[in-house]
Amino acid sequence: DGDDGDGD
């Protein structure tokens, strides 16, 4: 879900 913020 992109929790690291990259949207992947």
Swiss-Prot record:
It comes from the Eukaryota. Nacreous layer of shell. This is Uncharacterized protein SMPP2. It comes from Nautilus macromphalus (Bellybutton nautilus). The lineage of its organism: Eukaryota, Metazoa, Spiralia, Lophotrochozoa, Mollusca.
